[in-house]
């Protein structure tokens, strides 16, 4: 299998895109797969989609790093760098990124889900950071992104025990945002991606950017960023279309152009 086939990118007619992890058996996140994921994320940044769905297929999301590539400290540095480059690129995709988690999302797979903006879990989904069971720590962003999602105390508990979290608990603690039956997973993910893609996608990208920047700074700086972005969005064609449509036809009827 070529590196190109390890991660597939499909652009849909409605403007959304689907990214499919396609590594044999368990979608082990090898450095080769991560390199291809980085390329795909960079393409989705250079030529944005309306929204992005990341899936590992019907059976699982991703079972974690490719343990066969683990060796000494030099290997760890290279693997960690590959994870950071790829997952940071996923997090930096301008569009909303939706993780459709069908089964196991463990280790690096959980870290990939955490790099997404919204996580939809199948009832069969299982999340976890089990690195402690190998005597190591998460190296793909887990020590930083997991506390930001579930809080520091819960994140520490999950990482120091390595325990697995099923879908219902994942929603309860904020690790997943909603749970659906397995056969409804991609239907729901594509429905949400389609809804976002049919809306004011420039404003969507601005919302994502301002929220992400704001949670990393103090409230005053965040509000200043919001004010600048509020002015910025009023320069878009979509804002003119939306306001005009609201005044003439009421809410929810604007035909946005993405400009």
List each model region and its residues.
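Conserved CoA-thioester-binding segment of acyl-CoA-metabolizing enzymes
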Residues: 1-55, 88
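Crotonase-fold acyl-CoA enzyme core
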Residues: 91-202, 232, 236, 241-244
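Conserved hydrophobic/aromatic "anchor" residues
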Residues: 41, 61, 93, 127, ...
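Glycine- (often His-adjacent) and acidic-residue-rich active-site loop
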Residues: 6, 33-39, 47, 56-89, ...
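Terminal peptide-recognition signature
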Residues: 19, 37, 54, 66, ...
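Short strand->helix junction
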Residues: 26-27, 60, 178
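C-terminal alpha-helix plus adjacent terminal tail
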Residues: 1-14, 23, 44-47, 162-168, ...
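A general structural signal for well-ordered alpha-helical segments in protein cores
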Residues: 34, 54, 67, 83, ...
């Amino acid at each position: 299998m070529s590196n190109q086939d390890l991660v597939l990118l499909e652009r849909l007619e409605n403007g959304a895109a689907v990214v499919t992890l396609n590594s044999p058996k368990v979608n082990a996140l090898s450095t080769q797969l991560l390199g291809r994921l980085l390329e795909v994320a960079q393409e989705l940044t250079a030529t944005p989609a309306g929204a992005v769905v990341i899936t590992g297929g019907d059976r699982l999301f991703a079972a974690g790093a490719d343990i066969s590539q683990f060796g000494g400290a030099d290997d760890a540095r290279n693997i960690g760098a590959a994870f950071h480059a790829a997952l940071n690129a996923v997090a930096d995709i301008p569009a909303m990124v939706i993780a459709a988690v069908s089964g196991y999302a463990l280790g690096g797979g959980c870290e990939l889900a955490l790099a997404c903006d919204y996580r939809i879990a199948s009832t069969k989904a299982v999340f976890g950071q089990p690195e402690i069971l190998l005597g190591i720590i998460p190296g793909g962003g887990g020590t930083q992104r997991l506390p930001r999602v579930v809080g520091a105390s819960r994140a520490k508990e999950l990482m120091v025990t390595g325990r697995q979290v099923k879908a219902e608990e994942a929603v309860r603690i904020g690790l997943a945002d909603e749970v659906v039956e397995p056969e409804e997973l991609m239907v729901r993910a594509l429905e949400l991606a389609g809804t976002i893609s049919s809306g004011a996608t420039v404003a969507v990208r601005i919302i994502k950017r301002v929220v992400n920047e704001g949670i990393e700074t103090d409230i005053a700086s965040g509000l200043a960023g919001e004010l600048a972005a509020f002015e910025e969005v009023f320069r878009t064609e979509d804002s003119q279309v939306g306001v005009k449509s609201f005044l003439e036809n009421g809410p929810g009827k604007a035909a946005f152009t993405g400009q």
